């Protein structure tokens, strides 16, 4: 998913309940997304696809600015999926959440080497908070995710970032 995001500007709304996880020796080996709620294209990447399929922007509401898509992908793939898998595995006692978070942080640092301009990865590693969808707040604001414009369909809140590291701890070599 990180390759698709950085190469083609595609982000998927992967939800934890739509993930199939293959375990080997009690640890994740392979992750499959059996379904997703939707997808986004980063506007700056979408020129060619929009020429072929202009309805992606007007009808599917699938194209958005980079900051918007960063926020959604950060929430759906990392906050809603990966961090919840880390929580579930950590609860087994085989390994701690902190150890798993360190593995994820290491992976993101490697990805930052590959994609040094990635605002997505920079946000995951350096921001003090991460976006999370406030389902109750969304309902209290009487928003309907199925019919509201994509940029206003949900209420997002900021919660502490468990992946945060200091920028001085990262080598860009």
Outline where the language-model segments fall:
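Long, compositionally biased intrinsically disordered regions
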Residues: 98-173
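Active-site capping/gating regions of soluble enzymes
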Residues: 20-21, 57-131
């Amino acid at each position: 998913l990180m390759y698709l995001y950085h190469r083609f500007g595609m982000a998927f709304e992967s939800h934890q309940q739509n993930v199939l996880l293959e375990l080997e020796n009690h640890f994740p080996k392979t992750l499959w997304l059996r379904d997703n709620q939707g997808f986004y294209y980063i506007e700056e990447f979408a020129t060619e696809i929009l020429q072929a399929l202009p309805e992606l922007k007007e009808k599917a509401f699938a194209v958005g600015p980079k900051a918007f898509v960063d926020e959604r992908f950060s929430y759906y793939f990392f906050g809603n999926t990966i961090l919840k898998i880390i929580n579930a595995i950590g609860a087994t006692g085989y390994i701690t959440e902190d150890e798993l978070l360190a593995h994820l942080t290491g992976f993101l640092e490697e990805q930052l080497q590959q994609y040094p301009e990635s605002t997505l990865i920079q946000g995951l590693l350096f921001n003090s908070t991460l976006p999370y969808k406030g389902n109750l707040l969304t309902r209290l604001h009487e928003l309907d995710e199925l019919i509201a414009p994509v940029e206003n369909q949900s209420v997002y809140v900021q919660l502490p970032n468990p992946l945060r590291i200091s920028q001085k701890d990262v080598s860009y070599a």
